[in-house]
């Protein structure tokens, strides 16, 4: 935002520009993957940590709204437990690390309610929820549907 503030000669023009922009938000992948595994697991239960991440996302989205942003596409987190890095790093059985996917699902389950709450409380805002978890899950479960 600092760069944008310098580009516009006054705050009203910046606010108008931001109100016409679409913001793509992808949040919490690193937090729910390696960061939780290495650092946060000792400090928080996954329920508490997921709520903490949602609270932080809420603050950041409200801050963007205050600056003038009105249109948001907010994606949830993909099934991190199926990513090659996680699969090759963490001992597990099955094709994916289900403990991590359950962790991601806890966070993802909280996201739609947050977006509905924000849209109803922030006048003129539009929040669209992108379910990339479902998209990735479909690719992992039916790779043949996407080519040979």
Predicted regions, residues:
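Mobile gating loops/cap/lid regions near enzyme active sites that modulate substrate access
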Residues: 79-98, 113, 117-120, 124-148
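A structural motif corresponding to the C-terminal end of an alpha-helix
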Residues: 59-71, 107-127
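A short acidic, glycine-rich active-site loop
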Residues: 45-52, 95-105
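Extended low-complexity acidic/polar segments
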Residues: 40, 51, 55-56, 145-147
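Oxyanion-hole/transition-state-stabilizing segment in secreted/luminal serine hydrolases
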Residues: 2-51, 63-66, 70-89
